[in-house]
């Protein structure tokens, strides 16, 4: 199944991050907490402005982003993988290498 977001929505695949405890033990999965970083896997066409024009999004497929994991971010399972559906405004930053 494929998924295509509408308007200013994006689909993000959460990236797992490795954390260490105060004692140096590597924490993974639920012990490490949920990451607020992810990879953009699909983008909508853009935000519709009041005058009817479409403003393209600043993010693109493949971007690694830091996002606000709060109200308005929807978690869905697509092909047995968790993805997040959010508005571009829920993205706080693009991580540049």
Curated annotation (Swiss-Prot):
A GO MF label: metal ion binding
UniProt-listed CDD domains: cpn10
PROSITE patterns assigned: CHAPERONINS_CPN10
Keywords: Chaperone, Cytoplasm
GO CC terms: cytoplasm
Domain of life according to the entry: Bacteria
Subcellular location: Cytoplasm
Coiled-coil positions: none
S-adenosyl-L-methionine keyword on record: no
UniProt-listed GO biological process terms: chaperone cofactor-dependent protein refolding
Primary site of residence: cytoplasm
Role, per record: Together with the chaperonin GroEL, plays an essential role in assisting protein folding. The GroEL-GroES system forms a nano-cage that allows encapsulation of the non-native substrate proteins and provides a physical environment optimized to promote and accelerate protein folding. GroES binds to the apical surface of the GroEL ring, thereby capping the opening of the GroEL channel.
Record text on subunit structure and interactions: Heptamer of 7 subunits arranged in a ring. Interacts with the chaperonin GroEL.
Family: Belongs to the GroES chaperonin family.
Protein name (database record): Co-chaperonin GroES
Gene that this sequence comes from: groES
